[in-house]
Amino acid sequence: MDGAGSLTRSFFRSLRPQADLKAAAIGAVVLLREWVQDKRRERLHAARAAAKDKIKAKAVVEREPPPRVVALVERYLPRRVGISMTVLLLIGSCGFGIVKGGHLQDFVTAISDARNAMANSAGFRITSVVINGRKQLTQDEILAIGGVSGRSSLLFLDADAVRDKLKANPWIADATVLKLYPGQLMIELTERKAFALWQEAGRLSVIADDGAVLEPYVSRRFLSLPLVVGKGADTQARDFLALLARYPQVNSITKAAIFVGERRWNLRLKDGLDIRLPEQDVGNALAMLSRLDKEDKLFSRDIVAVDMRLPDRLVVQLSEDAAKAREEQFKDKKKKKAGDAA
C-alpha cells in the first residue's frame, strides 16, 4: 500500500509543470491577439482621422475668397452692428413691400386701431360728444368729416387734425375742437349759409355768399333760393343780388339773373321776359324799370325783351303775335290814309 501511494504522488508531481506551461502559453496567445486588435484599431482610427483632415483641407483650399467689401465688413464691423443692419434691412424690405403693394393706409389704420383700443381700455373712450352751431349738417356727418369714429380714443385724438378736416368742408367756415378728459369731446362750429343756386355748364350747385360751392343741388329745401347763371356769377352774385333787392318791384318777379360774358347781367322774369341790363350804372337801369312798370305797366305788356344796353334809349321787342298785330295796324292806317287822299 505504501509503495502504490508513493508511486501515485510521484506521477501527479510530474504533471504540474506541464499544466502551468500550457496555461502560460494560452495567456500569451490571448495577450498577443488583443495587442494585434488594438494596433488594428489605432491604424483604422488614424486612417479615418487622416481622411477627415484631407476633406477639410480640400474644402478650405477649394473655397473661393470672399469679395473685398465682404472681407472688410467681416474684419472691421462689430458683430452686433451687423445684426442691427440685418434687422433694419428686413424692416425696410417689409416697409417697401407694404408701400409697393398699396397697403400703407391699411397698415397705419391697424396700428392706430390697436393704439386706440389700448387707450379705450384704460378709460379714455369718447363717451360724450357736444356739437354747437350745427344747422345744415347732422352730428353723424360732422363726426365722419372730422374722422372721429367709435374706435377713436380721446387720448390719441388730434384736435388740430379734426379741426382742419372740418374746415376743409365747404359748409363749415370755422371750427373749434376741445378735448375734456377723460371722455368728452366738444366741437364749436360756424356754418356757412346757403345763399343762392348757381347754374354753370349744366350743373346746379348751392353756393354761399362768398361764392363757395356748398354742395350739388339735390334737395328741394333750397328751391326758394335765388338763381344765378353763367361763368363768374358765383363770385359776383352777392353784390348784384344785394342791389336787386333794393328794387322789390323788379326783384319779386325775377326768376334768374344771368351773368353775360363775365361783364354784365340779364334778368329773366317769371313770365319769360328778358331784361338786358347795361354794363355800367345798373342801379339807374333798375330804377327806370320800376318806374316804367308802375306808370305804364311795362311788365304786363305783350313784349319778350327790354334792351337797356344803350345809354340814351330803351328798346322793346314785341312778341310775335304783338308784332303781327302791330303790322296789321300799320297796314290799316296806310289804307285809311290812301282812301282819305283819294
UniProtKB/Swiss-Prot annotation:
Protein name, as recorded: Cell division protein FtsQ
Gene3D superfamilies: Cell division protein FtsQ/DivIB, membrane protein fhac
Cytoplasmic face residues: 1-80
Family the UniProt entry places it in: Belongs to the FtsQ/DivIB family. FtsQ subfamily.
PANTHER family in UniProt: CELL DIVISION PROTEIN FTSQ (PTHR35851:SF1)
Periplasmic topological segments: 100-342
GO cellular component: cell division site; FtsQBL complex; plasma membrane
Residues annotated as transmembrane: 81-99
Membrane topology: Single-pass type II membrane protein
Alphabetical keyword list: Cell cycle, Cell division, Cell inner membrane, Cell membrane, Membrane, Transmembrane, Transmembrane helix
